Regions:
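Two-component/phosphorelay signaling modules centered on CheY-like receiver
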Residues: 29-48
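A Lys-centered signature of the CheY-like receiver
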Residues: 116
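Conserved acidic carboxylate
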Residues: 26
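Active-site residues of response regulator receiver
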Residues: 71
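Acidic, metal-coordinating helix/loop segments flanking the phosphotransfer/catalytic sites
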Residues: 49-67
Length: 137
C-alpha cells in the first residue's frame, strides 16, 4: 500500500523533478532510506543521504544541487551551518524535524518545514511549493 501510494505521487511529480539533484541530510538510517526512496520515486537524483555535519558541509559547498531536505538536528548539532551555506549559494531547502521545538535563528523562521513523520504526499507538496517559480505580482 505505501509503495503504491509513493509510486502514484512519483508518477505525478516525475516530469517536474526528474532532473533535480536533492541533497539529503539525515542522521537516522531508517528515515534517510525512506526519504531517499521517496525522492527516487519522484524521479530525483539523490545526493547523500549524509548524517555527518562535515560531510554535509562538503556536499553543500561542492555539489551542483537544485534543493535540499535537511534534518534540523544531526550528529554534530544543529544544521545551521549547512542551511547558511545553502542559502548563500541560493539553493532552496526544507527543514525537517520530529521535535516539537522548531526554535531557529530569525533568518529561517519563515523557511519551509517538513514535520516528521511525513508522507510521500507531504514531501511532494513541500517540494512543489519550494521549487515553484515565483508568481509575478
Amino acid at each position: 500500500m505505501i509503495s503504491r501510494r509513493i509510486s502514484e505521487v512519483g508518477e505525478r511529480m516525475d516530469n517536474r523533478l526528474s532532473s533535480m539533484r536533492i541533497l539529503v541530510v539525515e542522521d537516522s538510517p531508517v528515515v534517510a532510506e525512506v526519504l531517499k526512496e521517496m525522492l527516487l520515486d519522484f524521479g530525483c537524483e539523490v545526493v547523500g543521504p549524509v548524517g555527518n555535519m562535515a560531510v554535509a558541509l562538503e556536499l553543500a559547498q561542492s555539489e551542483r544541487l537544485d534543493a535540499a531536505v535537511i534534518d534540523l538536528n544531526i550528529r554534530g548539532g544543529k544544521v545551521y551551518p549547512v542551511a547558511r551555506l545553502l542559502g548563500e549559494r541560493g539553493i532552496p531547502f526544507l527543514l525537517a524535524s520530529g521535535y516539537a521545538d522548531w526554535t531557529m535563528p530569525p533568518e529561517w523562521e519563515g523557511r519551509p518545514r517538513l514535520p516528521k513523520p511525513f508522507t510521500a504526499e507531504a514531501l511532494s507538496g513541500a517540494l512543489e511549493a519550494l521549487l515553484a517559480p515565483p508568481v509575478a505580482s
